[in-house]
Amino acid sequence: MRINVLAALALGCLALAGCSTGKSTDLGFAAAAQDGTPFTVSQVAGEHAERAYFFCPYTDKAQAEALGFNPDDVYSINDNSQRWETWSGIGVIFSDDRTPAIEWFDPSIIDACPGATTGDPVDVHAPITPTVQPVEFAGDEGPTDVIKLVVE
């Protein structure tokens, strides 16, 4: 059953062009979450992942900039209010020459913020466990299985 749910989520993500958005960088977190096994930021983003942060709905561009990210990589009420209100992500600062990047997640597929708020640091070596939970969305006929990312 769990494999079927994860396979369906993976296909849904592929249908959304790999869960990519104009502001999102594919760092590999969506694929790692859909695999269903615990992972760390450093395993996914590489050994040069120095710091990581959660980005939750209603992230403020100035808040992201204060953490070291490009404010243009963050949704706002002015450029995409629906994503600003609903999408979550994980942002990574690298110790090498790579640009800081945020991978954003469609809320019907992955929720990076159960119990977290924007700017909460993520230990790059701490296990993140993807757990599938049913979520009720307005207008849907029934619950949707969403992958929740839980830091241990």
Model-derived features: positions:
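Mature extracytoplasmic domains of secretory-pathway proteins
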Residues: 45-113
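C-terminal partner/receptor-binding element of secreted or periplasmic proteins
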Residues: 111-152
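Bacterial N-terminal signal peptides that target proteins for export
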Residues: 1-7
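Secreted/processed peptides and extracellular or luminal domains of membrane proteins
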Residues: 25, 62, 119-120
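C-terminal motif of bacterial Sec signal peptides marking the signal peptidase cleavage site
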Residues: 15-18
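Post-signal peptide N-terminal segment of mature Sec-exported envelope proteins
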Residues: 27-45
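Bacterial signal peptide processing site
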Residues: 20-23
